[in-house]
Amino acid sequence: MAANSWEQLIASWEPRMRQAFLDAVYQIRDSVKLTELVRLIEAGRIDDAVRAVGLDPGKFRSMTSTLLAAYEAAGVATMLAIPPAAVAAGYTLKISFNASAKAAADFLRYRSELLIREITEDQRRGIRDVLVRGLESGRGPRDVATDLLGRRNRITGKREHGLIGLTQTQQEWARNYARELATGDPAALKRAMRDAAFDNRIRRAIAEKRGLTIEEARAPFRAYLHRALRVRADLIARQEMRGALHASQHEAYLQAIAAGQLDADQIEREWRSRRDERVRSTHRKEDSVHQGIDGHVRGINELFVSPRAT
C-alpha cells in the first residue's frame, strides 16, 4: 500500500478511536448517581464506591467496535492494493480480506480484551486513590465525588473536568498542578498540559508572593484537566489504531501468500517511525547519535531487531 494511502487510513481512524474513548468516559461520568456515590463515600465504603462508578467493559463497547472496524478496513485496503496473480491462461487470482480468519479473530479478541482491561484496572486504582486521599485530607464526600465526576455542563449536559478518564500518573500531575497554583509555585508555569492563556494570571500571583485564590485557580485547573483527558485520548487512539492497522496489513499479506496470490519473497517491510521527540532512540533513523532501525527493511517473516535487541 502506498505511504500516503496508509497515512490517510491512520488519519481517518485515529479521530474515531479518540472520540470513542471520550464518549465512554463521559458515559461513565454521567451514569453515576451522585447522591449514592456521596452516601458511600460518607460511610467510608471505598470498595462499594469504586463499584458504584460502574467501570464495566460494556461502557467501552464503542472502542472495541472501532478497533474491529479499523482492522477490517485496513485489511480490505491492503488486499485491494495487491495485484491479482495469473494462475492459468486467461485466469487471475484475486482474494478478499477475511477478518473472520482465525489469526485475525484471535488478534482482535486479544487486543480488545487487553485494551479494556488495562483501562478499567488503571481507572479502578485511580478512583480508589482519589477516594482515599479525599477522606484522609478531610474533604467533604460531595467534594470528593465531584473531583471524580466533574461538574455538569449546563449546555451540553455532560460532566466535565473530572478525574475519571485520566491515568493515575495524570491524576498525580493534576494534584501537583493544583498545589502549585494554590501556593504560587513557579513550577506551575512549566506544566506541559497547562493552558498558557492563564500564565499572566499565575505570574501576577507569583509576583505578589501569593498563591491563586480558589476562584482564580478554578479556570486554569479545569483547562488542565480538559487537556489532560485529550492527551490521554490521543495516546490511546494513536497506539491502538496504528497497532491494529499494522497487524491487519500483515494479516492481509499472509492471507494473500497462503492463497497463492503473492510470494513471500515479493514483500518487503520498512520500519518508519514518526520521527519526533516521542520516538525512542533505538527506533529512530540511524545517524552519528542514534543507532536506530528507522528505514531498515525486512521480509514478511523477518524480525526487526533494535541495537538493544528489544
Tell me what each language-model feature is.
Residues M1-H226:
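N-terminal leader/targeting and assembly helices and adjacent pre-domain segments
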